[in-house]
A protein has these predicted regions:
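Edge beta-strands of extracellular beta-sandwich domains
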Residues: 97-106
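Short loop/turn segments that connect beta-strands within beta-propeller blades
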Residues: 157-161, 199-203, 241-244, 286-290
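C-terminal motif of bacterial Sec signal peptides marking the signal peptidase cleavage site
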Residues: 15-18
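Beta-rich, blade/repeat-based domains predominating
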Residues: 127-138, 171-182, 212-224, 256-268, ...
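Bacterial signal peptide processing site
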Residues: 20-23
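Conserved beta-strand positions in repeat-built beta-propeller and related beta-rich domains
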Residues: 143-147, 187-192, 229-233, 274-278
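Blade-loop segments of beta-propeller domains
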Residues: 161-198, 204-214
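A short helix->beta-strand "capping" segment at the edge of beta-propeller domains
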Residues: 108-127, 158-164
Length: 318
């Protein structure tokens, strides 16, 4: 290395150190004070906010917001969606402005009800299928199966397990949940970042759609005007029924905390039914705020099916 290069590096380093030493520590004058305990509050409560001002600055005004939406310093939470929130206080003082932030969690006020089930009938099913999604549409059962190199889309006569239509997915796709709307089938892939669209009658491909912030596809259902999609977290993403773009999301919470690994979904009488991967229960979720209103216990259902080496976990609802 030449002397010029060494001097150049030393000089540049000196400038960086000099600039670094001249900077002053950021003064924090305000913080958010609330009636929240351990950053958790119930949606039955009223959020009460104020500002801590230890340096006795002359405050002109304070503007509060929750996830960028303006709120007052006395806000009932009954109409607020559950989950993690960022509180922001913008403080105007002495011709200046300073922002204080606080992360909180809004949980449900009620404990989920516990439901059991009644087995009313059984039907034959292909035990080699790694079922990911099921849905009835005009009397036909549609099934999406998983595993790389084995994923399929099928239409079935469920009473005798006759395959009416069947297509194999590309070996690079791991099939996940599916739903049907307006004579179209929407099938998710797991980690491939896109969903597949088919004509319900011919199974002809009608294109695909890309995921947004949700990086994986697990389960999907619809209410006739919107799609709801899971990604394995506590989030349920709300998709536009025409563009398939993610417009919003809700977070599934009980009175104690979030429920993760949300998987297959089904829309039933205004509620979202969601099973959890590797769990034996199905959560009944309020689509307006993410509240888990009930849990259906299916733990003994696994004992009622044929035991074989490929048996894995409960999955698929229709």
């Amino acid at each position: 290395m030449s002397i010029f290069k060494i001097l150049k590096i030393i000089t540049l380093g000196g400038i960086i150190c000099s600039c670094g030493n001249s900077s002053k520590p950021l003064m924090i004058n305000f913080s958010i004070q609330s009636n929240i305990k351990k950053n958790i509050i119930s949606n039955a409560d009223t959020l009460k906010l104020s500002i801590l001002n230890p340096n006795n600055k002359k405050v002109d005004s304070v503007a509060f917001s929750m996830n960028s939406r303006r709120i007052s310093d006395n806000t009932p939470l009954k109409s607020i969606a559950l989950g993690e929130k960022i509180l922001k206080a913008t403080v105007f003082f002495e011709d200046k402005r300073e922002v204080a932030l606080l992360k909180i969690i809004v949980v449900n006020s009620n404990t989920p009800k516990l439901y059991n089930y009644e087995l009313v009938n059984t039907y034959p099913h292909d035990i080699t299928s790694y079922t990911q999604g099921l849905e009835f549409y005009k009397g036909v059962l549609y099934e999406s199966t998983g595993q790389y190199g084995e994923s399929k889309l099928r239409a079935l006569d469920y009473k005798n397990n006759t395959i009416l239509k069947n297509i194999e997915l590309s070996p690079g796709y791991f099939g996940e949940g599916l739903t049907l709307l307006k004579d179209k089938i929407y099938q998710l892939t797991w980690q491939e970042g896109r969903g597949l669209i088919y004509d319900v009658n011919s199974f002809e491909s009608l294109g695909n759609f890309k995921y947004g912030q949700s990086k994986e596809g697990w389960g999907i259902c619809n209410n006739g005007s919107q799609f709801y999609k899971t990604d394995g977290s506590e989030n349920i993403w709300i998709l536009n029924s025409e563009t398939l773009e993610e417009e919003n999301f809700i977070q599934a919470y009980t009175n104690k905390g979030k429920l993760t690994n949300l998987n297959e979904l089904e829309w039933v009488e205004g509620k979202i039914y969601a099973n959890r991967y590797q769990k034996n229960g199905v959560a009944v979720i309020n689509p307006a705020n993410g509240a888990i209103e009930a849990v259906i216990d299916f733990k003994d259902l696994k004992d009622k099916v044929r035991i074989h080496p490929g048996l894995d976990v409960l999955n698929g609802m229709a």
